Amino acid sequence: MMEMLAPENMVRVLFSSGGSDAVEGALKISRQYWKLMGKAEKTKFFSLKHAYHGVHFGGMSVSGGIPWRRAYEPLLPGCFQIDSPFLYRNAYTEDAEELGAICAANLAREIEHQGPDTVAAFIAEPIQGAGGVIVPPANFWPLIREVCDKYDVLLIADEVITGFGRTGSMFGSRYWGVKPDIMCFAKGINSGYIPLGATVINQRVVDAWEKDDPLAPLMHGYTYSGHPLACAAAMANLNIVESEDLPGNAGTVGAYFLERLGELTQFPTVGDVRGVGLMIAVELVKDKITKEPFAPHDPYIMEIQKICRNEGAFIRIQGNKLILSPPLIFTKNHVDQAIEIMLIAFEQSKFD
């Protein structure tokens, strides 16, 4: 795995049991890093609205979706969210490049407002998954890297979904041409066969632990961290991902899937089709002009899901969105079958 991450200059890994664990490790390492660097006041975290970073208190605190947080508040203090670069739904512009610049500038402005000497890290998913497969403009991540460098803030990429091929690139941050300081993995690391997560850090961060400091011991770990069975499954899985070029397949088949999904725009309720690789969403609206969303669990959306399931296509519902995240071995033939089923579902579902 570390050989795969050599271009990002990642040199150490902390194993855990899943994505939430991996994020928690990243947040703790970030705070400890700045204490070791003699900047103990750098404790705050920035993230994006619509973000999802797991179910631990740290991860929930940097998540940007209210439903994931509300029942457990108050959460960790010192966590702030900025507007997501959501092209279909934002208050700024319909121009992608302009939106990316605006959102990056928002981060810079908020860091200045809080004080750069108090901010530890910015954490984000290269493509926001559970929030609705929000694909940022191409300039967003490079600009975020510049902002983090300018204000001496660590950049954490939550690659729990995007890691190991789903975007068409081996890693989501690599897809955008950006090198984070810390990366979080799970899911694709061993295709979920055995629970495993990983937090990996680059040389810059590792160097802080070379100091003879009473705060240097990393007080973090889980009962099953680095479990041999989980790691063996990961090795076998990653060998297949790499040798069979599953990232390449995800990119090729994903592009074809998006093209075919364009056929759904003939229906009055399909407001947006978006995605990268095999990470796709179809957003449903009551009106294409106003973009009024369907309420969660609306009978119309549930009927579409039911028909698809009965016909053999399992589709996740997230609010008013159909989430499509098939295996990386998906083929164009599979896409054609899925589209045929979805067309049937939309034709048969009643919308008043």
Language-model-detected regions and their locations in the chain:
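Conserved N-terminal phosphate-binding loop of PLP-dependent enzymes in the Aspartate aminotransferase
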Residues: 1-352
